[in-house]
């Protein structure tokens, strides 16, 4: 569906089809028009695909994750043309600020840390990307989210690693936050930050008491916000299914998706 046909859709159907709100689409389009005018200030040949349709095709690729060949055929252009121009759209939007920007934290903030896995095709060096948890090859993305739902940082690792190891490699300083919530993958975080909370673990000799289970349940309920944010990011099928593209652009696309979520939540 091109931009002209999408004007017949209601706002709710537009959001379901493209993955972003209509107002967000218009703001992204304004950014692209400004960048295009600067790039082609001296004129040049008029492109076959308008900026409106180019943005629509790019968002359809991230939202539906069909092949470039299929989407290019829908818009009547060559596949290589769409690939080249879609990559320009992604880079331009991220450079313009549609990404995760670092936000200073205060003692009144509550932050939640979690990671998600994105499955990839089997690489040449299998063991570097093998996830024993999901029994597949995967990459990891770590997000730090405030209690209001704002993504304050996003870290990517192409090679699979433990959650706590990824946090240490990211070197994120969140000590200013009043409370830090994490799941059991971040055992040991309380040794770094005294305000951190992780679930209480049981052992064969020391099973969980009723109080421990109640604390774990309350912690899980409080940190559900980060799970909701990951669910929003994974409405883009590129993130929720097997990632087929070059892994070097995964971080850029993940930041773009998270930036769109932040923008639509009003941050």
Where are the model-predicted features located?
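Short secondary-structure boundary/capping segments within folded domains
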Residues: 17-19, 46-49, 60
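Charged, often Cys/His-bearing segments associated with DNA-binding zinc-finger transcription factors
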Residues: 1-43, 188
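Short, amphipathic alpha-helical "recognition" segments used to contact nucleic acids or chromatin
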Residues: 50-64
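Active-site-flanking structural segment that lines cofactor/substrate pockets
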Residues: 39-53
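Short, well-ordered secondary-structure "scaffold" segments embedded in the functional core
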Residues: 51, 68-267
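Short helix-loop boundary/capping segments at the starts of domains
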Residues: 34-38, 63-67, 91, 95
């Amino acid at each position: 569906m091109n931009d002209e046909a999408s004007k017949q859709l209601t706002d709710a159907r537009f959001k379901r089809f493209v993955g972003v709100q209509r107002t967000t689409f218009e703001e992204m389009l304004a950014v692209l028009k400004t960048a295009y005018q600067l790039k082609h200030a001296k004129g040049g040949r008029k492109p076959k695909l308008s900026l409106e349709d180019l943005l629509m095709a790019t968002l359809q690729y991230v939202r539906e994750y069909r092949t470039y060949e299929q989407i290019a055929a829908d818009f009547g252009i060559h596949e290589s043309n769409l690939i080249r121009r879609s990559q320009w759209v992604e880079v331009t939007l991220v450079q313009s600020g549609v990404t995760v920007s670092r936000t200073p934290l205060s003692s009144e903030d509550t932050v939640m840390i979690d990671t998600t896995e994105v499955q990839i095709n089997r690489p040449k060096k299998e063991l570097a990307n093998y996830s024993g948890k999901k029994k597949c090859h995967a990459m990891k993305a770590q997000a730090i989210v405030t209690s209001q739902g704002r993504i304050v940082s996003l870290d990517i690792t192409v090679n699979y690693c433990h959650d706590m190891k990824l946090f240490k490699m990211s070197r994120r300083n969140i000590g200013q936050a009043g409370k830090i919530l994490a799941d059991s993958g971040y055992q040991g975080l309380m040794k770094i930050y005294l305000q951190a909370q992780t679930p209480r673990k049981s052992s064969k000799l020391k099973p969980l008491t009723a109080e421990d289970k109640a604390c774990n349940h309350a912690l899980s309920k409080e940190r559900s916000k980060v799970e909701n944010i990951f669910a929003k990011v994974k409405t883009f099928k590129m993130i929720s299914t097997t990632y087929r593209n070059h892994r070097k652009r995964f971080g850029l696309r993940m930041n773009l998706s998270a930036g769109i979520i932040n923008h639509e939540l009003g941050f």
